[in-house]
Amino acid sequence: MKKISSHYSVVIAILVVVTMTSMCQAVGSNVYPLILVPGNGGNQLEVRLDREYKPSSVWCSSWLYPIHKKSGGWFRLWFDAAVLLSPFTRCFSDRMMLYYDPDLDDYQNAPGVQTRVPHFGSTKSLLYLDPRLRDATSYMEHLVKALEKKCGYVNDQTILGAPYDFRYGLAASGHPSRVASQFLQDLKQLVEKTSSENEGKPVILLSHSLGGLFVLHFLNRTTPSWRRKYIKHFVALAAPWGGTISQMKTFASGNTLGVPLVNPLLVRRHQRTSESNQWLLPSTKVFHDRTKPLVVTPQVNYTAYEMDRFFADIGFSQGVVPYKTRVLPLTEELMTPGVPVTCIYGRGVDTPEVLMYGKGGFDKQPEIKYGDGDGTVNLASLAALKVDSLNTVEIDGVSHTSILKDEIALKEIMKQISIINYELANVNAVNE
């Protein structure tokens, strides 16, 4: 099902459909430059270990795993196929851990662990999570190829990437978030640079999943005059505006993210410490029914309002204070970004709606009652953004990740990009 808001001109929409039947087969000069902002785990992440690093086992010794490193001792932390092997899963989890420092009121890496995001400004780290396993770890490859082939975009010229350390999240006003705030500064500079290198054209920001939350808050933290000059449109794919119920399973029992052979309990520890994972927990703004539990156990049930008790009962009481002070205020209001927005998401896919735990407790995987959504994010969350100049497109049967490669989904995304670029193509045609 497709829904388009009345804020868009009917005349323009009809003209676009009639005159652009071949989608957006434009030349590069007829497109607004586009920056991709990935979702959680949607780009490569590199690490190096210094003398302060204390391995949890001999398998995790820096001289043993990994053997091959880049110049300066850097190596890929995400994604690395060695995580599939049990002895190295723990090493991976140790190195992905974040620690909350109450004195700094901020998160930081484990001692001795330095991380960096490679290829900022390029799509290189978004195409594949592991270049050696391109088919198995393809992420935005199909989307980028479609933009090049169908819309005339040129990779790393009119289409760029804004990867980030997806473990970190933003914090509420008055609380520091050094890493994520630096990403917003880098993104702002990239937008300005991209516009300058493309004849001063404003930029389209195209996000997937968690990237949509970052873009929304990024736009909220800029001035109206800056947005008018530099931002043409915000296109959000599968954005979890109000979080997702499946994230409670991540905290309670661990989530392998579809990676085979991995024990979810081995990765649960670092997943709980991820600041961005807390950001993706179900919000009371969307999951506001106090009579409808999201997690059911023999002893107690939990709604979105009992997150502090949920944290304590799963054995993560240290997460209560930073969640309530830093993260929760971010989720309580979805502010208008001040630019035209197009939300594209799937529906009609079984999506966790209630997690039911038995006598085995949270170390066992739950039985799941399903509802509507994209398989990961619940429909209520996908549709939660209610702002001016909003265009909403729903695609039946498309999942949270397949929206980046499904043929029908890509066709719809290209169509929406063509609508945005249509005005520019007309102006250029008149001037020729």
Curated annotation (Swiss-Prot):
GO terms for molecular function: O-acyltransferase activity. Signal peptide: none annotated. One of its GO terms (biological process) is lipid metabolic process. Its EC number is 2.3.1.-. It is an enzyme of class 2 (transferase). The keyword Ribonucleoprotein does not apply. PANTHER family: LECITHIN-CHOLESTEROL ACYLTRANSFERASE-RELATED. This is Lecithin-cholesterol acyltransferase-like 1. It comes from Arabidopsis thaliana (Mouse-ear cress). The lineage of its organism: Eukaryota, Viridiplantae, Streptophyta, Embryophyta, Tracheophyta.
